[in-house]
UniProtKB/Swiss-Prot annotation:
Residues 690-897 form the RdRp catalytic domain. Belongs to the reoviridae RNA-directed RNA polymerase family. One of its GO terms (biological process) is viral genome replication. RNA-directed RNA polymerase that is involved in both transcription and genome replication. Together with the capping enzyme P5 and protein P7, forms an enzyme complex positioned near the channels situated at each of the five-fold vertices of the core. Disulfide bonds: none annotated. This is RNA-directed RNA polymerase P1.
Length: 1444
């Protein structure tokens, strides 16, 4: 598509504006315009060589493009696209606006041309945390290279199928000789010295050029899912369409234009920005200047934030000027992001604290809104401890006036005043006057949403850099070495007041007592979901123990050769690793070596042995993993974060140590996860009582977790104290953890008889010992954790660190951090009560290293009291060896931040840290469909907190995903015996097509939820149904081939089981398998060893229980699938483990490539497919009437970091209050999850519910007995089976709540009052006689549709009338469950139609029992399954891998 046409830009702008202005009556027309835009942009992106021209065919088939290998053609196409981008930016913008900042931009470009060449970078600069700026090539040489590209003929040569090896070598030499060199000055290259703790010399040398280029490729890579140029174009044109009179102008794009002008010279065909990406977003490299990639990233991020957070600036001149000033500053100094962030750190903490007459007057002063309007919870009381079993918001009102002026003045201490002055000076020193003016607005108290908007606008700009990447070794050494020195001083007792003996004098006994008492409580069954398993149970559940909670393992590389091809799998799947290791994973001997530095180890060897080892290391014959095993060292990984933060170390725990912890402290973690089973009796954790402090007891994924703090801030009558400790893990000394483990051991020895006869692990270094009991595992782990050495590796540089503190990869990291934090908090509260006017702690919570304390503020009146609380808090953390910044220890009655949850005056908001385009690392997806479904999930999460227009943002996400959704298809030319590459774009409706269709991405149309089946059915079906036939053909099945083929290979002796598994056609004969791993525990294993371990773990008693239950069920005509039977658990577990394997992307091919290529010649009509064909329940539902509603809740808006439509939903429906479905449903599903996990099953929660219904056990004369038998057949465990059966019978309503919560949870409706009594104000279900629980399901279907309509109606509320096709429903219910022989006998052969207006039931002989047609619905009906709407469909994984 030629955008040079004078009418195309206004045409596109017009199309966008029509979509933005459309309402619910114009939804289908708006979607047609969207598809037209997608077509135009796809043609623009790929050129005019589309092989499908007819629009109807495009909707049905998609688009095909031939892909040229000619570098000149590719260069010309990208030059045209960049030219179009620049034309769009300048479109109808006055010349003075375009050139306003040209002097600054040209100065930036001049600075880029004057930075040192790469070979002038010093060794110290090369090792800096941030990659130094440097030039790769002189501009004139770069232009000469561009000319050389134009004369290279070989890149476009056709590769003949019968090309000889000599021809290949000659062709390769020609290409290398003529290929341009993009790095000047190779003659000036030199070798630099890098550290290597695993070399005898402790160092090695490498070329400076290689080191810098490797850093550049690693640290500048944004890990996009598609090429950024189309994203830039789409973002810019949407900003133009959405801004005032299309006048938006980007000075970031202007910078790119002037750079292109500078480097290209007069040749327009070379006028491209010198950063190279592949079509799939892969980073290829940069030219001329090192930091072009980060500048491009910042420009795209800036445009994206301006579009998606548009309500923060509303395209006002001042806000856009602030943004431009910060962007140009960052383009000039791309490595100064940390400096900018540091300059405003304290303003970020102490915003809105200064109380003055402007605050009291409640007017608008100099454009700033001081109106007093925020939520207030008048019933909130903090004069006594708050001890909730569950947290939920109370009713809130709108507060219009101040009532706590004393605290207003008390919190604004002289210290706080000084912090703010210093930050304002820091910004002034950066010469950013517009930013200075903006941040100055953050000082005064403004008790309404506008101050949050201004704060968020600042934080958006701090996130322009995306994911921060730097030199990991430099970052780690800076933090770890300094902290290690501090720790050694603390352990040595050099400071008489701050030392380990003083700390352990009070902490060690308390730690031991807590460990002892909680172990005792677990052993005595106080916490039903926490227990110490037997050794057989532990081994059979091993897949659960190595779920995502374990920090990681080394990668496992598997090469699988079949009769058709060779597959490569590179995985970190812990389940796969355990199944490859077998019982070896339980042997502690290989990892029990005393950790030593290599230099120290060599000194212990004889001269001859030392010389041989040094030679083996230097030659590479001694592998790194073997060397680290000998030295007892572990690995350090890394984690990148946003807002310019340094890279964080992630310590990789060996699996033997992880399993040891799972056996001894895992039950403690389980006891403190999920809601309380008992009413807390005090604030504090003692072991007997869990208290209220553990965040995990209240975690629901919502702001409910800290309701007391948010409600306290609404009243202004309580003080929140927020402790900000840095590097907590590194300052949490092992010496203070060991007492807790000693307490566990003491309780085990006193109370656990099974400790005498259960052997959980083995130590092959000890002969004649059958295994290790739990108490012995505690001793081993205490010895193991006393001192460790971890080795960090980055670009072949390696550094070893001695660790005597909490390493972050441990299973107990979050739990033990929380335990110590809670103990310190208690000590602080006791001292505050003694020293600060008897001020009492009302509530607190800890989440690992985060702590929040809420004190009763009634006795606080002076700044001196607040200062004293700060001093007490800081000193207690410092005396516990933690690093706490007094300047970041915020004490406020109105604001706070805890665990990334922010609040101000009862309003809640989230940091804009989610990156839309960038990823921390490459996607683990093995095909484009899976990758873009993951991207769709990111878009969905991003848009929920983006303060802009949800409709615009959702459209933006769909266009970005649609332009990235392409597949390369080779087409064989028989006449030339060559392959021509083709690029295929599926039908454009694949973007919103639900994920149940193989090629559907399931992105949201309304922004409310994913896979919006009902909305599509009602409004978009005409368009979507055209492409579903072809969308269903899009399939990448290499993963399925691998998993099925491996299952057939290892289970070849289980022919009946294989038959029941129905592995299908995706099966190839395995001829050979080889394994490699970088993990220390791996020593050349095979999946058969894992299978043997699982077989040995089968309990004979459970086996007999399971078999008997299967026989009993069979006698009632009920068959249990053999794949779920307890005796086949080892095989099912191995099969599920194989499903977690994903082949490398280069071997994951598009299975239907030939079929889709044949679409080019496909002449007959492609059939339409109904969207409900994969979701038949939605065929039952109709919206019979929609009436206008002119009623709003009249309540406040609490959730500020939500799109405009999200706030409209909250205004109309009412803000979240009371126990919502998330809480009830979450608790219900945990019963099933506990059963699955405690028995080591591989069935998912959904599959278990489906099995219950389809088996027919609910229709037995005694359904409770049937349930017990069914659960026993799966687990062999009588106790847990009886408990789950009782739960099903007693807690019937919770199943509807659970299914409903998965519709509400995670969506914007989560911010609203979604209780059924409130929902009925907006939805009516026209089925008065229908069973109530079934009615409720349909109420929530209508509720979601109500919200979707409101989003597309500009906030106009409607009453939704839901009608059900009763005949279809009756057929659906009959077809959803089998008819057993016993039921046929009861009912007779003639079947009467179901009467939906009554609770029709069959009378049976058993007293007080009856079977209703709707009984299964009361428990858990398949109608619930499609409501898992916001859960993206994934490849099948272990249940334990799905749940974090």
């Amino acid at each position: 598509m030629d955008l040079a046409r004078s009418d195309i830009i206004p045409h596109l702008l017009c199309l966008f504006q029509e979509i933005i202005q459309a309402n619910i009556q114009k939804v289908s027309e708006a979607y047609d315009l969207e598809l037209k835009i997608m077509n135009i942009l796809t043609l623009w992106r790929n050129g005019s060589d589309n092989l499908i021209s007819d629009n109807d065919d495009y909707m049905k088939k998609g688009l095909f493009f031939s892909r040229s290998n000619d570098p000149l053609a590719l260069q010309a196409r990208y030059a045209r696209m960049y030219d179009d981008l620049f034309k769009l930016n300048n479109y109808e913008v006055p010349d003075d606006v375009v050139r306003r900042h040209d002097n600054k931009i040209l100065d930036i470009i001049l600075k880029e041309s004057s930075v040192p060449f790469w070979y002038d970078i010093s060794d110290d600069e090369a090792h800096e945390s941030m990659l130094p700026e440097f030039r790769l090539q002189d501009i004139h040489e770069f232009r000469l290279n561009l000319k050389r590209v134009r004369v290279v003929p070989d890149e476009s040569e056709e590769i003949q199928m019968d090309e000889s090896q000599s021809d290949k070598r000659r062709r390769k030499k020609r290409m290398e000789k003529s290929r341009p060199v993009w790095l000047s000055g190779s003659e000036s290259d030199r070798r630099i010295e890098l550290n290597d703790s695993l070399k005898p010399s402790q160092k090695f040398e490498t070329k400076l050029s290689s080191y810098l280029l490797n850093r550049l490729m690693n640290e500048m890579n944004p890990h996009y899912c598609g090429h950024p140029l189309p994203a830039l174009f789409v973002t810019l044109i949407m900003l133009k369409a959405y801004s005032i009179k299309n006048k938006f102008f980007s000075y970031g794009i202007r910078y790119m234009e002037l750079v292109c002008n500078e480097i290209a010279g007069p040749d327009l065909n070379t006028r491209t920005f010198p950063v190279l990406f592949g079509s799939d977003g892969s980073f290829v490299g940069t030219r001329v200047y090192s930091h072009y990639p980060i500048k491009l990233r910042m420009i795209l991020n800036d445009l994206t934030y301006l579009l998606t957070y548009s309500d923060l600036h509303k395209f006002q001149e001042f806000e856009l000027d602030v943004n431009d000033e910060v962007l140009l500053h960052m383009l000039r100094t791309p490595n100064d992001g940390r400096q900018l962030k540091k300059a405003v750190t304290r303003l970020n903490h102490y915003y809105g604290l200064k109380f003055n007459p402007k605050t009291t007057d409640c007017g608008v002063v100099n454009g700033m809104d001081f109106t007093h309007k925020h939520p207030i919870t008048k019933t909130a009381d903090f004069t006594s401890p708050v001890l909730p079993m569950t947290n939920s918001f109370n009713k809130a009102e709108i507060c219009y006036g101040h009532n706590s002026k004393i605290l207003n003045r008390a919190v604004f201490t002289d210290t706080v005043r000084g912090h703010i002055r210093e930050d304002l000076k820091n910004v002034a020193d950066l010469d950013l006057p517009k930013l200075y003016e903006h941040v100055s607005k953050l000082v005064d108290m403004r008790v309404n949403y506008t101050i949050i908007y201004d704060l968020m606008f600042l934080r958006v700009m701090l996130n322009l850099g995306g994911y921060s990447r730097s030199n990991q070794i430099t970052d780690f050494r800076k933090t770890i070495d300094e902290i290690t020195k501090m720790n050694e001083g603390f352990l040595s007792g050099a400071d008489p007041e701050k030392n380990i003996d003083t700390l352990n004098a009070w902490m060690a006994p308390t730690m031991e007592d807590c460990g002892y008492r909680l172990t005792k409580s677990i052993l005595f069954g106080k916490f039903r979901k926490a227990k110490y398993p037997s050794d057989l149970e532990a081994k059979s559940n091993i897949d659960y123990y190595v779920t995502a909670r374990s920090a990681g393992i080394g990668n496992l590389r598997i090469s699988i050769e079949t009769d058709k091809r060779k597959y490569k799998v590179r995985t970190t799947s812990k389940s796969a690793f355990v199944n490859a290791m077998g019982s070896g994973i339980l042997d502690v001997n290989p990892v029990s070596n005393e950790p030593m530095m290599l230099t120290d180890y060599l000194l212990t060897q004889t001269p001859e042995t030392r010389a041989n080892l040094e030679a083996a290391i230097d030659s590479g014959s001694k592998s790194d993993s073997e060397l680290m095993r000998i030295l007892g060292q572990n690995s350090i990984g890394s984690r990148s974060t946003t807002a310019w933060r340094p890279v964080r170390p992630i310590y990789i725990n060996v699996l033997q140590a992880h399993l040891a912890q799972a056996f001894i402290i895992g039950p403690h973690i389980n006891a403190t996860v999920n809601q309380h089973e008992y009413q807390p009796t005090s604030l504090w954790f003692t072991g007997d009582d869990l208290g209220v402090g553990f965040a995990t007891l209240y975690q629901s994924g919502t702001a409910d977790i800290i309701v007391p703090a948010i409600e306290a801030s609404s009243t202004g009558k309580a003080l929140s104290v927020l402790a900000d400790c840095s590097s907590w893990d590194q300052t949490y000394l092992t010496a203070t953890m060991i007492p807790y483990y000693n307490g566990i051991k003491r309780a085990l020895l006193e109370y656990q008889q099974a400790d005498m006869r259960n052997f959980y692990m083995i130590d092959s270094g000890r002969t004649g010992v059958p295994g290790m009991k739990l108490s012995e595992i505690v001793d081993w782990f205490n010895s193991f954790q006393t001192k460790r050495i971890f080795n960090a590796s980055y670009l072949k540089e390696r550094h070893s660190f001695v660790v005597k503190y909490m390493w972050s990869g441990r299973l107990d990291t979050f739990f033990m951090n929380s335990v110590q934090n809670a103990l310190i908090t208690r000590r602080i509260a006791e001292e505050v009560s003694l020293r600060v006017s008897n001020t009492g702690l009302s509530w607190f919570q800890v989440a690992g290293d985060d702590a929040i304390m809420v004190y009763d503020g009634s006795s606080i009146s002076t700044t001196e009291q607040v200062t004293r609380i700060n001093e007490i808090t800081v000193r207690n953390y410092e005396e516990s060896n933690h690093i706490i910044n007094p300047q970041k220890t915020v004490i406020s009655h109105i604001s706070g931040e805890y665990a990334k949850i922010y609040y101000y005056a009862g309003m809640h908001f989230r940091d804009p840290s989610i990156q839309l385009h960038e990823s921390e690392k490459d996607s683990g997806a093995s095909d484009v469909t899976e990758s873009l479904r993951e991207f769709g999930q990111v878009i969905y999460e991003y848009n929920k907190r983006a303060i802009g227009t949800l409709r615009v943002n959702a459209l933006y996400g769909r266009l970005i995903a649609g332009l990235a959704y392409s597949v390369n298809c080779p087409q064989y030319d028989a006449s030339k015996r060559t392959y021509a590459n083709m690029k295929y774009y599926p039908p454009p409706t694949s973007v919103i097509a639900p994920a149940a269709f193989k090629g559907g991405l399931g992105l949201s149309f309304t922004g409310l939820s994913l896979n919006e089946v009902l909305f599509i059915k009602l409004h978009l079906h005409e368009a979507v149904s055209q492409g579903l036939h072809v969308i269903s053909m899009i399939s990448f099945e290499a993963n399925e081939v691998v998993s099925n083929s491996l299952s057939a290979y290892y289970l070849k002796d289980q022919k009946d089981l294989l038959r029941d598994m129905k592995l299908g056609k995706h099966l190839e004969k395995v001829k050979g398998i080889s394994f490699k791993s970088s993990d220390l525990a791996f020593s050349g294993s095979d999946f058969s060893q894992g299978l043997n371990l699982k077989r040995e773990s089968i309990d004979k008693v459970k086996l007999e229980v399971s078999r008997k239950s299967i026989r009993d069920l069979r006698s009632s005509g009920i068959s249990v699938p053999s794949t779920h039977a307890y005796e086949n658990l080892p095989y099912a577990s191995l099969h599920q483990s194989f499903k977690s394997l994903k082949v490398d992307r280069d071997t994951s091919k598009f299975t239907n490539e030939r079929l889709l290529v044949s679409l080019l010649e496909y002449k007959s009509d492609i059939p339409r497919v109904s969207v409900t064909s994969q979701y038949p329940v939605y065929d039952l539902i109709n919206i019979s009437k929609v009436d206008e509603l002119n009623v709003r809740s009249g309540g406040p808006v609490r959730f500020i970091s939500a799109p405009i439509e999200g706030k409209l939903l909250e205004e109309n429906i009412g803000t979240r209050q009371g126990v919502q479905f998330k809480n009830r449903g979450y608790g219900g599903s945990q019963e099933v999850l506990h059963f699955i996990r405690s028995n080591g099953l591989v069935i998912t929660e959904q599959a278990l519910i489906d099995l219950i219904i389809k088996s027919g056990v609910l229709l037995m004369i005694n359904p409770q007995r049937g349930l017990i038998d069914l659960f026993q057949s799966l687990s062999g465990d009588t106790a847990s089976s009886m408990h789950l059966a009782n739960f099903f019978m007693a807690e019937k309503p919770h199943w509807e709540d659970n299914a409903i919560s998965l519709t509400i949870a995670g969506s914007l409706l989560e911010n609203c009052d979604s209780r059924i009594e409130n929902v009925k104000n907006f939805v009516s279900v026209l089925a008065t006689g229908m069973q109530k629980d079934l009615q409720r399901m349909f109420y929530y279907v209508g509720f979601v549709y109500y919200a979707q309509r409101l989003i597309w109606s500009g906030g106009h509320s409607s009453k939704i009338f839901v009608s059900i096709d009763e005949d279809k429903l009756a057929d659906f219910l009959r077809g959803s469950k089998p008819i057993t022989r016993r039921r046929k006998a009861m009912a007779g052969t003639k079947r009467e139609p179901i009467n939906l207006s009554a609770n029709f039931s069959y009378e049976i002989s058993e007293p007080d029992r009856e079977i209703s047609e709707y009984d299964p619905l009361i428990l858990c009906h398949p109608l619930s399954m499609p409501f898992f709407g916001n859960w993206q469909e994934k490849y099948s994984v272990m249940q334990s891998d799905e749940q974090m």
